[in-house]
């Protein structure tokens, strides 16, 4: 069966969320995008939508999943439904330093200042980060976003 590597860093990192749209997806390993920052941009609903921007000195962690090609359309529809489109051209790097081409989605909107992450997105990101054992510092950073007084 043909499949596609998918890098999840936002709400579809949550094992329940990805299983809803791609029941055949299997988690392979954790990885990161070097020189990349997690941002939250305005979405159609006006909430902080997770996305990525290239920026030195930052790293974004996530999980790489093997998604059956027959389910890529449903995953794409779900990501687009949240306001993201395919199009991140940076290779994900695993813990051994290997680089991987992955299907990755970023917000349609360009970064336009700092926005508070939407609670549902952030909760899913934290659940997934904990579940897949992403680095503790990354998980703590996500948790801190929900407690940041600048976003209150």
Name what the model sees in each region.
Residues 1-152:
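Glycine-aromatic micro-motifs
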